[in-house]
Amino acid sequence: AYDPVIAVGAMDWSFRPAYYTDYGPWVDIAAPGGDRYSGKTTRTASDGRTVFYSNAQILSTILCDDAIAYQDGRKDGGMYGYGFMQGTSMACPHVSGVAALGLAYAAQNGKKYTPAEFKALLLSSVYGIDDCFTGSKDGELGPIADMAVYKNKMGGGCIDALKLLFAVKGTPAVYVRTGEPVTVDFARYFGGDRSRVAQTAASFASPGNLGLSSSKAVFDGMKITFDCPEPGTSMLRISAVSGDTEFVREFAVVSRAGLAANGGWL
């Protein structure tokens, strides 16, 4: 790919490469592009035809002119003017949209970046998907026998808007697996000698977002043990003291059903 641009690969709903996507070491990042062969169901038009726009693709606005007799059911019922589509033309806008969101958030927080700095920030705001490249899947020209051929060829992972916003703000994000107990030592985020850091107060801003109750979070010094029954996000505010210096820091605790080896989420 032309080096100054960002090359985007397309993935399906199961985090695997879409059958049509290009791939290779030059791909920078992946994003949802849809894949009609990975859909579990299709939509049926009023005349009984199975329409092209299945729910394994990306919901998009589409041309809808009453003077044109379309053959794909796009004027049926509540779908008027909308359709499920697929392609890198769907994947690329995900990345450009997240980039625009990040730049707007940076302006709101008084942050400025050079193009190279923001590109690096954007491309590092991903979650790993290579572990999903297993088995086979259907494609336009027949089954794709071995999904492992895509490994290390779909960029650093799938674009993660939440991770980009945390990076812009400078908020540390702690990712945990939904439904599994975890103990996190937050002392390392306060610098210096960990043994001298003592917690004075800690609280989740929105514990309900994670399915947490007061009895499900155990605070032991700077270590917090908790189990998030629900996927979601909550800010965690910790007050601590090291010697005669007091600190207050906020963390984003993100609960996801699956975690990638690189610390991202699936």
Which residues does each predicted region cover?
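Surface-exposed or secretory-pathway low-complexity segments enriched in glycine-proline
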Residues: G191-M222, E250
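C-terminal edge beta-strand
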Residues: D244-G258
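Hydrolase catalytic cores
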Residues: G34-Y150
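Low-complexity, Pro/Ser/Thr- and charge-rich linker/hinge segments at domain boundaries
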Residues: A257-L266
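Solvent-exposed, low-complexity, repeat-rich "mucin-like" stalks and linkers
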Residues: V168-A198, G263-G264
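Mature extracellular/periplasmic domains of secretome proteins
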Residues: A1-G9, R16-G34, G97, A120-S124, ...
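Extracellular/luminal low-complexity segments enriched in Ser/Thr/Pro
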Residues: G221-M235
